[in-house]
């Protein structure tokens, strides 16, 4: 073979190698057009491993609220909105919002409805759509007391094949004193749980803790050993750290603190925890400002919540919190939180591992730092990680949904 031919072959090989090693296009956050339009807020994402649902509240007028949802299709777009309920006497709050959960094709949703003209009196109403049915069974009571007090901050999860496990903050012992009442005649906010059928009927309910923080979200998950509920506790010394209680062999354990932050604060920070489960793995995220150190923390448990590892921490005065978590497998997950820097306020997300490692921090999207933006949402389905939040556009709001490939984390 002559030298010219050898030279040509060599250059051809180099050319092909350079083509094969071309830099792939950059990974970017991808928008999913929202089907609900403007005047929408308070999104909630729900995945059962096969289907992703998005719920939200639409306010066509100042006095009317519509609870709606959509399904993510195989083509990656949202379906037309379907209505769950509508009302003019609802309690609609930026931190205490309606949501829905799935159980093998059956749906359970909930919203808050005022029980009196008072500011701090509202009830939790359930809406059930059993698999195969087309009409929602609505307006079903969750709690069995008739006190005109606060009931809210609901969380729920599929429990058995035929039931859901629901937890909530319950003000029946407060006497209607409002948030953080120190009136001598007012009792404390408590947390309760109930098992609810696919038809929306309460099977049993019980008190989990007689004294909790008044207005931080609860969070519920199901491990291989049973249900867990995570919430912000409140001690007699006003220490408000994150607690967990577990349903084991038919009995709830005494609440225990996940990590002793020692956050002493006289009022509610309106910044609750989030928990997710897979097998015996738990991942919990929460906000704290103990001793003036503002941070979000994330901790894994490998024994269904009996013990937790050292927290993975993101610290800084710009940390807002409003955490979200999702598991990728039994050793890793996605953590999300809100954070303000010199460029603005953003929803941030990163991969975290049970060994303590945190990966690249992704800037998912710009957010309003105030209450209007609500609490961002996170779910993993298939090879994508989905996010939702309320985008503030001047005087109006609109739900925004985006995704990143799971491989980006």
Per-region residue spans from a language model:
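Extracellular, repeat-based ectodomains that mediate carbohydrate processing or recognition
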Residues: 20-409
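C-terminal motif of bacterial Sec signal peptides marking the signal peptidase cleavage site
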Residues: 16-18
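Sec-dependent N-terminal signal peptides
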Residues: 4-14
């Amino acid at each position: 073979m002559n030298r010219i031919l050898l030279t040509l072959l060599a250059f051809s090989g180099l050319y092909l190698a350079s083509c094969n090693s071309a830099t792939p296009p950059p990974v970017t956050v991808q928008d999913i057009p929202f089907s609900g339009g403007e005047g929408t807020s308070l999104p909630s994402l729900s995945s059962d491993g096969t289907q992703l649902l998005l719920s939200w509240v639409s306010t066509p007028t100042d006095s009317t609220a519509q609870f709606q949802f959509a399904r993510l299709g195989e083509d990656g777009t949202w379906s037309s909105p379907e209505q769950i309920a509508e009302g003019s006497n609802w309690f609609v709050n930026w931190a205490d919002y309606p949501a829905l959960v799935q159980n093998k094709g059956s749906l359970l949703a909930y919203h808050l409805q005022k029980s009196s003209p008072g500011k701090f009196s509202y009830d939790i109403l359930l809406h059930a759509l059993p698999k195969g049915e087309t009409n929602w069974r609505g307006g079903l009571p969750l709690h069995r007391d008739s006190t005109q007090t606060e009931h809210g901050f609901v969380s729920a999860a599929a429990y058995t094949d035929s039931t859901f496990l629901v937890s909530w903050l319950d003000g029946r012992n407060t006497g209607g004193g409002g948030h953080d009442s120190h009136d001598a005649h007012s009792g404390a906010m408590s947390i309760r749980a109930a098992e609810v059928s696919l038809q929306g009927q309460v099977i049993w309910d019980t008190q989990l803790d007689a004294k909790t923080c008044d207005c931080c979200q609860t969070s519920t998950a199901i491990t291989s050993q049973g249900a867990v509920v995570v919430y912000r506790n409140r001690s007699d010394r006003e220490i408000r750290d994150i607690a967990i209680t577990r349903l084991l062999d038919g009995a709830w354990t005494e609440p225990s603190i996940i990590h002793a932050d020692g956050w002493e604060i006289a009022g509610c920070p309106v910044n609750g925890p989030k928990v997710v489960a897979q097998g015996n793995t738990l991942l919990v995220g929460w906000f704290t400002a103990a001793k003036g150190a503002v941070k979000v923390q994330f901790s894994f448990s490998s024994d269904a919540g009996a013990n937790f590892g050292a927290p993975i921490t993101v610290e800084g005065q710009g940390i807002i919190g409003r955490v979200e978590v999702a598991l990728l497998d039994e050793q890793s997950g996605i953590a999300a939180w809100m954070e303000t820097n010199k460029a603005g306020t953003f929803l941030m997300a990163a991969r975290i591992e049970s060994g303590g490692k945190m990966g690249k921090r992704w800037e998912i999207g710009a957010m309003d730092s105030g209450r209007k933006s609500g609490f961002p949402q996170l779910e993993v389905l298939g090879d994508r990680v989905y996010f939702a939040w309320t985008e503030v556009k001047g005087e109006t709001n609109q739900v925004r949904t985006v995704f990143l490939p799971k491989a980006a984390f």
